[in-house]
Amino acid sequence: MDKIHSLTGMLDLYNDGDRDNLSVKVFEVEKVLKRIFSNYQLNEMRTPALEDTDLFKRSVGDLSDIVNKEIYSFNDRNEKSIALRPEGTAGVIRAIIEKKLDQSAHKLWYLGPMWRYERPQKGRYRQFYQAGVEILGYPEGAPEFEIISIICSIIEEFKLKNCSIKINHLGSKTDKESFCEALVNYLEPHKDNLDIKDLERLSRNPLRILDSKNEDTQFILRDAPSIKDFIDSSSIQMLQDIRSQFSNICSIEIDYSLVRGLDYYSGFVFEAVSSDLGAQNSFLGGGRYDHLCSNLGGRDLPSIGMAIGIERFASLLDTVIPSNRMTSF
């Protein structure tokens, strides 16, 4: 009989003590992250791997690559469209609403498998583990500093080099609307040079075009308006204060071109990058999403979160500590 093999991009993880094994690094990373989350007095939440597909269409965005190209979705025996979760935040917020927990503040963490149909490469798989932090019910201010503090603790704990945290602010709803209007006006003469996907982004969510992977689009955007000219001074001051407070611990860079690939982000956004990962150099990201809860049927719940890809992060550890010298942290 022919052998049955694992599916493309799906890894078996086995903690056999071999320090050259990615599995061992994954287990080490998970163990340390759990300890860091405990130090920050975060509570664990676990949500189902399967969710209603509409949850991700309404949260991540039906124009996102995740929903259009990467999500594993299918109809169950009742012809209901369900999906393997491609990310963790939407499920957490769905649970918060369903359990009527959106009336109070919470500080949570989660860790579990996620699924995306993308081209497997080093540190990127079709089934991957993701850890995340969600700080819910707290207005903008202290949570931004706390989330960056958590990231700096992770970077410090693993002694990471060649990495930095990029931060930006997408402004208020009014700021964003003014910026999007200016962006659309700038891109209008260039519409014939945009591909179909970017044209759709331009018409439905112009901010997302800044996240385009199309080189021609990025060339056009070189002289586009900057969101820095549209957000208020307090937002800029927050970015400067965060950079100032943590600059002696981590490399912090204000990047006004940074947007996140998920539709629910608003206000403060960030990502951690490493030059050791090559062109796709991000291993952690997140931001504020004050309106996601109400978009999913709950009440407005000011919130901020972050997520880290475990395998991708674990692939960095060889650049920090040689495998044969790696010990438990």
Predicted regions and their residues:
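Positively charged, Gly/Ser-enriched RNA/tRNA-binding surfaces
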Residues: 25-42, 51-52, 69, 79, ...
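Acidic, His- and aromatic-enriched active-site or binding-groove loops in soluble protein domains
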Residues: 65-77, 181-210, 274-276
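Polyanion/phosphate-binding surface patch
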Residues: 2, 45, 49-82
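Hydrophobic secondary-structure block in the mid-to-C-terminal portion of proteins
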Residues: 158-195
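A structural preference for short, hydrophobic beta-strand core positions in alpha/beta folds
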Residues: 46, 167, 254-256
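Auxiliary tRNA-acceptor-end handling modules of aminoacyl-tRNA synthetases
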Residues: 1-25
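Beta-rich nucleic-acid/ligand-interaction surfaces
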Residues: 50-67, 166-179, 259-267
